[in-house]
UniProtKB/Swiss-Prot annotation:
It holds the Pfam family Kazal_1. Gene3D superfamilies: 3.30.60.30. This is Ovomucoid. The record marks M18, E19 as: Reactive bond 3. It comes from Bonasa umbellus. Keywords: Disulfide bond, Glycoprotein, Protease inhibitor, Repeat, Secreted, Serine protease inhibitor. Disulfide bonds join C8-C38, C16-C35, C24-C56. The keyword Cell division does not apply. Residues 6-56 form the Kazal-like domain. The keyword Glycoprotein applies.
Length: 56
């Protein structure tokens, strides 16, 4: 099973859109979109990973 990944190299960003395209993090939390998820990845110092696309 290949690991799912998202390119977060352009993050963090100061503001995210309200666009709803959910991603499920390795913390079993649903993030509303890539921006919200990538900001959380940066804050976690890389310990947070993408579990899968869609809600948890």
């Amino acid at each position: 099973l290949a690991a799912v990944s998202v390119d977060c190299s352009e993050y963090p960003k100061p503001a995210c859109t309200m666009e709803y395209r959910p991603l499920c993090g390795s913390d079993n939390k649903t993030y509303g979109n890539k921006c919200n998820f990538c900001n959380a990845v940066v804050e976690s110092n890389g310990t947070l990973n993408l579990s899968h696309f869609g809600t948890c």
